[in-house]
């Protein structure tokens, strides 16, 4: 029996999320998944994310070693991977990540995304040049979200 985490077996997580929804206003699911160093979201990740959302998860936050897409599925934000914020792996793409912050404003909810980098064991805001911003946005933008640049060098979207 797995005692450190819960399997992504739908027979396990679906009833668990349903039960959590009965007693909680908001359910955030954090998942470690995907192929290391791969920016593309796998079919399996997408299937599991949609199943988690259908089970009632309000937000899904995934982890992989690199940044992956952000999707809005049936008003459930899915951050497939926030990237890597703890390792000084020699691959530069593994030293990039993002912090997400949610703001509730009546019926409109908004997420703020701040690009970060890890260098010499320290995490800081990633002060990107124009090309880096284009790459970052292309790495995370999915057709299901209207991603907008903000005045702080990050991004926002409503759902």
Please give the residue ranges for each predicted region.
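Acidic, metal/ion-coordinating pockets
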Residues: 1-159
């Amino acid at each position: 029996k797995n005692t450190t985490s819960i399997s992504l077996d739908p027979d396990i997580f679906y009833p668990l999320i349903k039960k959590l929804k009965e007693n909680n206003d908001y359910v955030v699911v954090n998942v470690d998944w995907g192929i290391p160093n791969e920016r593309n979201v796998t079919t399996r990740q997408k299937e599991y994310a949609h199943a988690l959302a259908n089970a009632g998860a309000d937000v899904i936050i995934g982890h992989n070693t690199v940044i992956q897409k952000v999707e809005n599925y049936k008003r459930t934000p899915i951050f497939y991977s926030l990237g890597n914020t703890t390792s000084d792996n020699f691959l530069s793409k593994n030293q990039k990540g993002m912090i997400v912050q949610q703001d509730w404003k009546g019926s409109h909810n908004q997420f703020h995304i701040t690009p970060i980098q890890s260098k010499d064991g320290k995490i800081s805001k990633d002060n990107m040049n124009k090309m880096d911003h284009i790459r970052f946005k292309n790495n995370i933008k999915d057709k299901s979200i209207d991603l907008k640049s903000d005045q702080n060098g990050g991004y926002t979207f409503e759902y």
